[in-house]
C-alpha cells in the first residue's frame, strides 16, 4: 500500500521514483473522517455529519437524525465499509458491523461516522496535480454503479461541470497535492449543489474512461515521477461514454438494475466504449467466461 512508501522511501534505492503528496495530506485524503472535515473547513459542501465515540453516544443524536442515514467507516474499498440505516435499531446494528470491519484495518482508528443520506445522482472527478497545482480534472456522471447502493462506476460518461472542477481544485490546492487523486460526489437537487463524499489518493477504478477521453493519467504520472513539467493546457473530451460490462455492469443487470432491452441496446451502441473493442477480439478468451460465472454464482446465492 502507498502508506508504506512514506515509511520506507528514505531507505529505498535511489533510482526508484515516486510521485507523492506530503504524508499529512495523504493521511487526510485516505481517511473519510479527516477528508470530510477538511472539505467542510475550506467551504466545500459535505453531508450533515455526526461523530460519536461509541454506540452509547448514538442515543445523544437520535432526535437530530432523519432517516435513512449512512454509516461510514474510515476505510474500506468500493463502499465495503458503508451501510444504510432506516431506523434506530438498524443504525445500531450497522454501527457495530462497520466498527468491527474497521478494527481489522491497521490504519483505521476512529468509530464510524453517521452522515445525512443524499440520494444522488453520483459523480466522480479524477485529477492530477503537480506541486500543489492542478493540471487536469476529468469529471464524470455515473449512470450505474456496483454495488447498486453505491460503489464503482459501471456505466458512466464524461461531463462538463465547473462547480465540481472548482471544488476539487480547492481541495487539492489546499492539500498542496502532488500526484493523482479521485473524489466522489452526490448531487442534491433540492439544494442544487454537489456534496463531497470521499477522496481516494490513487487512480480510480474508472480510469479507463479518463484515458478514453484523451487524458492518459498513467502516462502523465510517469512524467511526474520523471520530474517533467506537466502542461497546463491538457483537455479532456466531454460526453465520452463507457461501460464496464464484464467487471461490474453485468452484475447490475442480474440484480434488476436495468432490463434485457437496455443490455442489448447498449451492447450495440457505437457511442458506448467498453473493456473490449472490435480490435480486441483476440482478448475475448480472457473474458468470455465472466458473465457465465456471474450467472452461476447468482443462482447459487438465490438457492
Each language-model region and where it sits:
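Conserved metal-phosphate-binding beta-hairpin within the catalytic cores
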Residues: 173-209
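ATP-grasp fold ATP-binding core
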Residues: 39, 64-84, 104-120, 137-139
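Glycine-rich phosphate/pyrophosphate-binding beta-alpha loops
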Residues: 79, 143-147, 153-155, 200-214
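Conserved N-proximal alpha/beta basic substrate-recognition cap immediately N-terminal to
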Residues: 1-51
Amino acid at each position: 500500500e502507498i502508506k508504506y512508501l512514506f515509511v520506507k522511501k528514505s531507505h529505498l534505492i535511489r533510482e526508484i521514483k515516486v510521485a507523492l503528496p506530503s504524508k499529512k495530506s495523504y493521511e487526510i485524503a485516505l481517511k473519510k473522517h479527516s477528508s470530510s472535515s477538511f472539505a467542510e473547513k475550506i467551504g466545500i459542501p459535505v453531508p450533515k455529519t455526526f461523530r460519536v465515540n461509541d454506540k452509547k453516544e448514538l442515543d445523544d443524536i437520535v432526535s437530530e437524525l432523519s432517516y435513512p442515514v449512512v454509516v461510514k467507516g474510515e476505510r474500506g474499498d468500493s463502499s465495503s465499509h458503508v451501510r444504510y440505516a432506516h431506523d434506530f435499531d438498524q443504525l445500531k446494528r450497522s454501527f457495530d458491523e462497520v466498527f468491527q470491519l474497521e478494527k481489522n484495518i491497521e490504519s483505521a482508528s476512529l468509530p464510524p461516522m453517521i452522515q445525512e443520506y443524499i440520494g444522488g445522482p453520483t459523480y466522480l472527478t479524477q485529477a492530477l496535480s503537480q506541486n500543489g497545482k492542478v493540471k487536469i480534472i476529468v469529471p464524470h456522471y455515473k449512470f450505474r454503479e456496483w454495488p447498486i447502493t453505491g460503489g464503482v462506476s459501471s456505466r458512466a460518461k464524461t461531463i462538463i461541470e465547473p462547480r465540481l472542477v472548482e471544488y476539487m481544485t480547492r481541495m487539492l490546492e489546499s492539500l498542496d497535492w502532488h500526484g493523482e487523486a479521485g473524489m466522489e460526489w452526490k448531487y442534491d437537487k433540492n439544494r442544487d449543489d454537489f456534496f463531497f463524499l470521499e477522496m481516494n489518493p490513487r487512480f480510480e477504478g474508472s480510469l479507463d474512461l479518463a484515458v478514453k477521453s484523451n487524458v492518459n493519467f498513467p502516462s502523465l504520472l510517469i512524467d511526474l515521477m520523471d520530474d517533467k513539467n506537466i502542461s497546463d493546457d491538457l483537455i479532456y473530451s466531454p460526453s465520452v461514454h463507457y461501460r464496464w460490462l464484464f467487471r461490474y455492469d453485468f452484475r447490475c443487470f442480474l440484480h434488476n438494475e436495468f432490463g434485457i432491452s437496455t443490455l442489448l441496446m447498449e451492447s450495440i451502441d457505437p457511442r458506448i466504449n467498453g473493456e473490449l473493442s472490435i480490435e480486441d477480439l483476440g482478448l475475448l478468451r480472457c473474458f468470455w467466461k465472466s458473465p457465465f460465472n456471474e450467472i452461476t454464482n447468482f443462482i447459487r446465492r438465490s438457492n
